[in-house]
Amino acid sequence: SINSVGGVILPNLLKALGVEYKFINGEANGEFAHNPEPIEKNLGGIMGELANGGYDLGIVVDPDVDRLAFICEDGKMFGEEYTLVSVADYVLSNTPGNTVSNLSSTRALRDVTVNHGGVYTPAAVGEVNVTTKMKDVHAVIGGEGNGGVIYPESHYGRDALVGIALFLSNLAHKGCSISELRATYPEYCIAKNRIDLTPSTDVDAILVKVKEMYGKEKDVTVTDIDGVKLDFPNKWVHLRKSNTEPI
């Protein structure tokens, strides 16, 4: 819970779910023990703890408890992109329906949705864009590939607590280890890179050029609701301007 509010509420949730746990950086004092973003490069401590054995899984949340990541029993990352995939798998198995995630998220959610007979719809990056699209298509589950789970039955907002409950329910229902659960989902690799440009760079012109270059290709689907996304048969590229960071 990286020394933030998660340390206040997570013990109550885990106890209610019958989970035995050990807290790392659980004191809610606001003094982060490391970079609080729940991604692999920041989680060496808890990954090492898991690798030493004796645990079924690791749970990591960010300071405001809206991003959620899991670590397998062997100390390897479950994958932040796959938090939503696993939760959606469980929700769709009980409540058939549609799903939504942002354009920069893994294709695995689409695959799982189709397997359950639903329809996957992409949205522009940003929680408000995802929730708006979820309402439009009456999605039963959605979110973002950074570990953000949005479950309308609870509320229209990213919520790691809801994600934990649904993920653990899926794990219990499947009756397998977390690494075995991970192996049941399509394996996609994803790289998220930031490109720092000079202020004089005309990013919009670049995006228009990319769209023009690939728009006539038969095997490429171009989406321009948020930058430009190019979907090839076995890969994709998404280029966009950040709304939260200078470029």
Cite the ranges covered by each PLM segment.
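Catalytic-loop motifs flanking and including active-site residues across diverse enzymes
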Residues: G6, E80-V87, S105, A160-G163
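Short Gly/Thr/Asp-enriched flexible loops that form oxyanion-binding sites at enzyme active sites
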Residues: I9-P11, D66-L84, R110
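Rossmann-like NAD(P)H-binding beta-loop-alpha module
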Residues: S1-A16
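Phosphate-binding and adjacent anionic-ligand microenvironments
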Residues: L57, T95-I247
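Short, acidic/small-residue loops that bind anionic groups at enzyme active sites
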Residues: M77-N94, N98, A124-G126
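Short acidic-glycine loop/turn motifs at beta-strand connectors
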Residues: D62-P63, C72-D74, F232-N234, N243
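Short hydrophobic/aromatic-enriched beta-strand-loop microsegments
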Residues: G18-N25, M77-Y82, G117-V125
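N-terminal small/polar loop signature for handling phosphorylated ligands or for N-terminal nucleophile
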Residues: N12-I71
